[in-house]
Structures are given as C-alpha cells and as structure tokens.
C-alpha cells in the first residue's frame, strides 16, 4: 500500500512508523496504545496522504477520550504537536538561527529583540525545553494554533519570545538573562497565563493592553475623537468600555432648540457599527460595552436596545449594555421599592444647577439628588421622568433575565474603594467588568494589561512570590509597548494600571479539597496574591519611581493598608510593614489586581476559567474543527468537586464568594452567573435576589447571566472575554 508524503512523493506504507508515533504519544500515560492502533487501521487505504494519516490519528485519539479516560486528550495533543514540529521545524536548528529567521521574516519584529547579543541569544536557547510542548492537550494545541502562534512558531518559541521581550528592560545583561529564564519557566510550566493580546501581538511590537474605557464629553469633537480612538483600539485588539453619562438625554435642548437632542441611542448605534467594521486585528470580532447610569433620562430606551420592542433602527445587537447603579437607588429598592426615582438629563442638570452628575457618588450623589428633587418640584428642570423604583427594577430584571444583560456596576462601591479617588472618578466598567480606573474625557482612557496566575498549579504558600514575579512581568511589558492612542499613553504614564488575575479558582479549591463555601480560603488566595503584587510594586517604585499620581492616593494616605490589615486572614503577611515601605518609597502601580474571565486562555492553559465555578467536569468546546473534549485539572483526584458544576449552585450564594475575594482585589472580579432550569426552578425573585445580594455582599459588578432552559445544556463560549483579557 502506498502513502503520499507532504512533498507529493509516494512510498510504501510502514506500520512501524505509525506504531512508533503512537507509542511516543502514549508514553508515561495510563492508556492502551493498541486501542488507537485498532481504530486507526480502519481508516487506511491505498494512496492515503501522510497528512490524512496524522489527522486521523489525532481525531481517533480525541474520540477515545471519556470523562474517566481523559488522558487520550493528551495523546491527541501530543500527536498534533508532533505534526506541528514536522511542519514548522523550529527545533531542528540552533535557536540563534531560528531567532534570526523570525526577525528577518517580520514575525518577531519588536525592536527590543535587538537588545540581545548573539551570545545572549545562544545562552537563551539553552533555556528552551522542547518536551514541554508535549504537556498540552488537544484543546490547548488547537487554541494555540488558531489564536496565538505566529508563523513558524511552536508553543515553547512563543513563550521564550515573550520572555525575552518582558526581560529586555532589565538594566544589565546578567539580570536580563536571569529574568528571561525566570519568565520562561513560569510560562512554560503553565503557572502564568498571559492575556490574548500579549500572546498574539507582543512579538510583533503591537498593543498588548487588554482593557480600555472611554468617556466622551457632551461635545461633538469629544464624541467623534472618541469614535476614532475606539476604532484604533479595536484595530489593535483591545476590548472597549464606553460611558454615556455625560451625553444629554433625548428631548433635551440642542443649539438653542428645545427637544432637539436625539439622546444616547444614536451614539450607541454608531459605536456598535464601528466595532463591527473595525475588528480586532482581523482575528476576532470587535467588542465593547456601553454604560448608562440609572439616573439618566434615556434609561428606559436603553434597556430596550437589544429587545424586539421599539424602532429597529435604534437597536444595537453587537455591543454589550451595562447599567451603573447608585447605592441610593439600591437602598431605596431595599427599604421601600414604591419610592420615587427621578431620571434627568446631565446636560440640563449641569447648565441649571451647576452639578456634574457623573462625578457624584456616595454622599455627594445623595446631596446632588436632593437638589435635583427640589429643582424638579420648583419647575427648574424640564427634562425628567418620575418612576417608581420597583418599575425601573422590574424592567431591568426583565431584560437581564431574557438577554443576560445589561451588566450591573455598583459605582458607589467602585468609587469608594478607588485607590485614586483623590484625582478623579471611575465612571463605568470595562468589557469584562474586572478592570477599571480613573477616566477623564479627552485626557485619560482607562488602559490596563492583564495576566493571570494559574492557581491550580501553584502551592498556596507560593502565591505571593508568583504574584510578585508576574507583577514585574506586566510592568516590564508596559515599558516596551506603545498604547494605540494618546489618551491611553497618558493613562499608562500617570497611573500604570495592571491587572494580575486568577485563572482556575475552581482548580485550587478542588486540589485543596475546599469549596465555594470556604470563604476564608478564597479570601486567603486573593490576599496572598495582592500581597505579592503590592510588595513587588513597592520594590519597583524604589528602583524607578512611584506612579505620578501617587501623592494623595489611598496608597499614600495608607488607609488601604489599614483596610487590608483589618480584613487579613493570613497571620504571616505583614500589611503594616508594607504600609511603612510604601510611605518610604511609594508604589509603582495605581492598581494591581483584576481577576478576568480568561475563557479562551484557560483552554490553552488547561485550567478552569476565571474566578467562578467550572462549566462541567467534562465538556465539549466548539471550534472550526468541530467539538473538542475538555477535561478538568483535578477531575480524577476530586471528581465530586467537579461534578458540582456552576449550574448546581444557588447563584446568589456565589456572590458571597466573590465578595470574599473582593476584599483583596483593588479593581473588580469578573463574575458571570448561571441559572439552570434543569436543576433549579427559576423565578424573577431568584434573578432579583442575585443582583441585590451581589450589591449587599460587597461585589462591584455582575457580569452576564446565562439561563439554561429545560432540556438544554450549558454551551461554553468565549466570544466576549476573549475580546480583551482572553
């Protein structure tokens, strides 16, 4: 029987080659190679290509996998990896040769590669452990090939290339090489998970920031400058947040004409279509969220931007809405939902009362709202609507239940905890609701780079050290990349916001035989990570300088350290010592931690996604090649934990876990919730309780809601979160 090789030549079929490949892929695993041989023999025929042989081996190994025999996913991944090795040939030559080829062909075009001498590159080549490619399952390999690997790359080359760039800013050749090895070891051992923009863009010298928030003024130039910036950000792979709270309401005066304003919905439509047109570097859909505060007079129309109600021309189906809730509204809802709530136009309130309502939170908002109530009663304000609190709440719940959105942001809590409230305001949440900081129209666009600790592979007592190193990596990355627009450059310069996250909280809970009810343990995980980040950021301030807006911040005043000391569950961590060091040296970053959903990168890292419970012990991921099985990190060791997947939880109870972690997260936590009608009866009361309990339990946001109908299954998708954090 003849087989056709990749070069088109025919040769006799050699079964020994196939058996050798199968045995290599099965080596050290608890699988029987004969099972794969038997399956494979059924697909042989005269004239079969070697590519078809390899594809069939990969497919059959994948299909042999079951929840109790999931090591076949590793066999399939190894076979796919070996196939990639043969095609790319990156390990068949000295690393210095490979490095020069990637530089010459433009795949590794970042200018900081030039910092390394030939001798240093040769030393770096000795760090590479080719065999670590073989620890990736088929879902991991497919994710890498479809999203992250550049031309002629294998996984270890991706890791070493990024490690070289992150280390390139170190001050001496010796320290550079030490950092390259350190960063490479963490990445290749799958203890760190970089965000998608860093995996895709860094080696080419493109943007590697994940999250952006824009807040245009109610001014034509400001709005259209922001549209242009949004296009640039999307082009460069960023996920977008857009605050609408400055924009005058529908029916407000415009250029002296009463009732001339069209309100916020036309602006949302333009942004929606901009993000559809300008996708993310051609690899992913453009993605963004638009935010409107609950006090804005367009709020009822905003609720319907993705429903079937109203004018089709006002709809925006490709963007994610969010509502910014104030504590006063939530408290009225709690105390007496029949109370009145007045929505107004921010432009009119500013013109007639001198109140910039988007800048009002907590007690300031309560005072401003009292003035607004009086102005309405006195007939000063013309553009307003009176609602019962319960009517607005019911409308929100109806849309949230049907569509899973709008997101909910609890903006008084967000601004109360803001480390930089001395210098501005946080207006809304980012696309995945975990990263936000001060934004100033036409001056600052919130900009943040993210990466996560794969906590299921890290010992609890090592979390702080790993977080310190990852903080260094993200800060080094900030130094070597150019943000896509000037306002982002301004933000990076003055605030230096990064977001160290948590990938696979479920996995560390499973490994340690804990549960989502073990709130102190969840707090401990977050505290140890925050401590490591803060410690390294203070050290970097000592080496370089504090972030420019440090003076007057909560870090400078020290109350944030007092709060950490008060909430601490780790006796071995000395927050008061860090407070003294910060007083002496300052801190390099304004904000440090942001647990993101990281669904896409979790496939690459073979970990549960983000902070919330896993989807299932064993599930199927949809991709261009069909459905690929995905198993759990500790499914064999602790199957009972993974059997209790996200749908089994009372979702309002999960908000306690998020609140427990939030005590030691200085921005937000991306938390999506699932109501599974196959497991629990679901009522409007359940949805209401979920959002209210999230507010009461000290969380800052509710990401989206998934409602699973009877007879349906939870389908895993990464469309939203892979748009920024990955």
Q: Where are the regions that the model predicts?
A:
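Catalytic alpha/beta core of large soluble enzyme barrels
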Residues: 120-140, 144, 433-440, 474, ...
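Short, surface-exposed, low-complexity cationic segments
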Residues: 14-31, 161-167, 609-614
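Core nucleic-acid recognition elements
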Residues: 9, 31-170, 178-184
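Function-dense linear segments that define catalytic or interfacial modules
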Residues: 150, 158, 162-176, 180-256, ...
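Secondary-structure capping and boundary motifs in well-ordered enzyme cores
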Residues: 10, 49, 154, 179, ...
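Internal maturation/activation junctions in enzymes
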Residues: 469-489, 513-598, 669-670
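Terminal amphipathic helices with adjacent charged low-complexity linkers/tails
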Residues: 72-106, 325, 414-441, 498, ...
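Conserved catalytic alpha/beta cores of large enzymes that bind or transform nucleotide phosphates
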Residues: 261-269, 276-284, 289-390, 406, ...
